[in-house]
């Protein structure tokens, strides 16, 4: 059980993060090294893996970090459970763009975990999520957009949702989504499950 005053404090923090998100075109075609980060759980332990992959060769290396997670799962506050472990898992990895398993600005306070990590690290991030957290889906010119309060905050390709975290824009998300679910996140997901079993 999380006290109401703590959630209100965290909401204020999220609004501050959202104000510091930079939306600008990055250019997916310029990415040579891409990173992905994911997490799996066993009891109250979180197993986070960061993967750095060479776009051209497909070669990758990874780092893992295991830590205790005491904050409960509350929709909209995922960053409190996962961001600390994810940040530790990507420390020192070589990459130009970070893909985070979770939302960016397609979030009720425009401050999903990809936005939080992107702002804290001052780094280009895109959130790639398996379910919609907020907003309405609208089809335009063969692309499904996520609208929040009249603003486009994300796109849906297949069953996945892509939204800017920091230092990227919606066009970057579209270009990424058109390529299918990112291989670097598939690898990160596979490794978290493998490490969790060890």
From Swiss-Prot:
Marked site positions, Interaction with target DNA: 73
Reaction(s) the record says it catalyses: Endonucleolytic cleavage at apurinic or apyrimidinic sites to products with a 5'-phosphate
One Gene Ontology molecular-function label: single-stranded RNA binding
Swiss-Prot/TrEMBL cofactor(s): Mg(2+)
Statement: the UniProt record of this protein carries the keyword Nuclease: yes
Broad class of enzyme this protein falls into: hydrolase
Protein residues bound to Mg(2+): 38, 101
Major subcellular site: cytoplasm
Biological processes annotated in GO: DNA repair
UniProt xrefs under InterPro entries: Endonuclease-V
Family the UniProt entry places it in: Belongs to the endonuclease V family.
Function text: DNA repair enzyme involved in the repair of deaminated bases. Selectively cleaves double-stranded DNA at the second phosphodiester bond 3' to a deoxyinosine leaving behind the intact lesion on the nicked DNA.
Name by which UniProt lists this protein: Endonuclease V
Lineage: Archaea, Thermoproteota, Thermoprotei, Sulfolobales, Sulfolobaceae
Underlying gene: nfi
């Amino acid at each position: 059980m999380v006290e109401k005053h703590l959630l209100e404090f965290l909401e204020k923090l999220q609004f501050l993060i959202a104000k510091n998100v930079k939306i600008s075109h990055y250019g997916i075609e310029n990415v040579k090294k891409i990173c992905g980060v994911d997490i799996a759980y066993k009891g109250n332990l979180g197993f986070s893996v960061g993967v750095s992959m060479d776009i051209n060769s497909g070669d990758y290396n990874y780092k893992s970090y295991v830590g205790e997670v005491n904050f409960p799962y509350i929709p909209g506050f995922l960053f409190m459970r996962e961001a600390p472990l994810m940040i530790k898992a990507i420390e020192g990895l070589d990459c130009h763009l970070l893909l985070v398993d979770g939302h960016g600005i397609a979030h009720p306070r425009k401050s999903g975990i990809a936005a939080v990590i992107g702002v804290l690290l001052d780094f280009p991030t895109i959130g790639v999520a398996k379910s919609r957290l907020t907003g309405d889906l609208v089809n335009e010119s063969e692309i499904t957009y996520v609208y929040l309060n009249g603003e486009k905050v994300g796109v849906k390709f297949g069953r996945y949702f892509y939204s800017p975290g920091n230092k990227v824009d919606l066009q970057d998300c579209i270009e990424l989504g058109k390529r299918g679910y990112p291989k670097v996140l598939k690898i990160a997901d596979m490794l978290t499950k493998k490490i969790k079993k060890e």
